[in-house]
From Swiss-Prot:
Miscellaneous: There are 2 genes for eL20 in S.pombe.
Subcellular localization(s) per the UniProt record: Cytoplasm
Species of provenance: Schizosaccharomyces pombe (strain 972 / ATCC 24843) (Fission yeast)
Protein's name according to its UniProt entry: Large ribosomal subunit protein eL20A
Gene3D superfamilies reported in the protein's UniProt record: 3.10.20.10
Family indicated by similarity: Belongs to the eukaryotic ribosomal protein eL20 family.
Described purpose of this protein according to its UniProt entry: Component of the ribosome, a large ribonucleoprotein complex responsible for the synthesis of proteins in the cell. The small ribosomal subunit (SSU) binds messenger RNAs (mRNAs) and translates the encoded message by selecting cognate aminoacyl-transfer RNA (tRNA) molecules. The large subunit (LSU) contains the ribosomal catalytic site termed the peptidyl transferase center (PTC), which catalyzes the formation of peptide bonds, thereby polymerizing the amino acids delivered by tRNAs into a polypeptide chain.
Assembly behavior: Component of the large ribosomal subunit (LSU). Mature yeast ribosomes consist of a small (40S) and a large (60S) subunit. The 40S small subunit contains 1 molecule of ribosomal RNA (18S rRNA) and at least 33 different proteins. The large 60S subunit contains 3 rRNA molecules (25S, 5.8S and 5S rRNA) and at least 46 different proteins. eL20 forms multiple interactions with RNA and proteins in the central protuberance, connecting components of core functional centers that are located far apart.
Protein's gene: rpl2001
Amino acid sequence: MALKEYQVVGRKVPTEHEPVPKLFRMRLFAPNESVAKSRYWYFLKMINKVKKATGEIVAINEISEPKPLKAKVFGIWIRYDSRSGTHNMYKEFRDTTRVGAVEAMYADMAARHRARFRSIRILKVVEVEKKEDVRRNYVKQLLNPHLKFPLPHRRTGVVGLAGKKVFAPHRPSTFY
């Protein structure tokens, strides 16, 4: 699922009783504008008692990442409905964008808890600035500046077909 981050601003329709109603802004993750509007009204009805029939959307904007090439750690607070009830959870993900971290969170929740998009509510997504503030060990291990990955399988040979042998006297050893 290719998600995008949207900022949706809406309010109640102006009336004689309330000529300048209060604006409500939300940042939502959705695959398209239509789903973003739908989720907006779903949350607004729960939180602020404003229904789609008595409200209007003032603006909807797609939010882009300011530094999409820098790896960052994101903390995500969620509330999800499982078969046994509603649970609060905090998770951390290392990614280059907020949208990438949220997509990883949805995949992780589906894999570990069988929770789908419709049953997960994102409360807050925050970039964790300092290494000391990272809570989860599975993210802390990636913050080592001298991190190295092993080369478990070596493939030797000549690039191209010019020096390739048809028959070899023994199988090559490809492990270090």
